[in-house]
């Protein structure tokens, strides 16, 4: 907040395309240096996560001269029109809004139960044979950890195969790090866990600690494929957001939040795993996730895998009554995601977990 207050006293708006300013340039340079790929990088800023994914697709299309985009079932990429088309969940993101932009295709995401990495890749090759030639695909977009889709971690084997397929066919690989980026998974970017290098990276949310700022980090030659003025926006990369973004990077380093995320994740997973073993509570899955990006499913029965469809919203409502904010996710609406602030104390984390445990006990008796 101190960084934002100082920037507020200097200036709040110029529009970067009209008059460049230091916070934008400084933040872009720092992100270029931390880009999760080798070679020269460039960064452009926007306002929302949906803008980031839309513009990443625009960059990929400009660089390749192709139109097709492949996304994953269960993925979430925003609420703008193209971002809604990329999103792999019908309700509430698609159904009411009519025809969405075309040349967007979806393949299944591995779920550790019914769909394997091999299944996903088989469907990708089937797509190439049945619906769109790989020579007409501009990009494949994937979340290293699906957010709205249920905190399902993209297997390293899948990411490596996608990278190889993209290299073979000249397709650009987009990592949507809007929810998984900036220390949440124990790395600055979630895809770094796999060692796979994307071509474009979408960023937002924790980038500026909640201030409206998003962006795309990309290989320089791709970013340069767009003509001047082709990307941007009146409020894109606003000075207050950039000042906040610079402070966020400093805090991640100073407070060792990468280590904190890993330690917090271990604490969360250990506690949730203990619930999984108990028969006096609602049946839940084992926890999953990377770092402090952790979730579990509410199940129909103990030792099963079938999710209790739609029950997540009920549990979240109960938690709110007890003073805890939770969010459900997953295609079945039965997944509880835990996104504790990385700056929260262990005592506060335990207090929240105590509330969840109490609800799971009470609902089992209801």
Name each region found by the language model.
Residues 1-366:
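Conserved N-terminal phosphate-binding loop of PLP-dependent enzymes in the Aspartate aminotransferase
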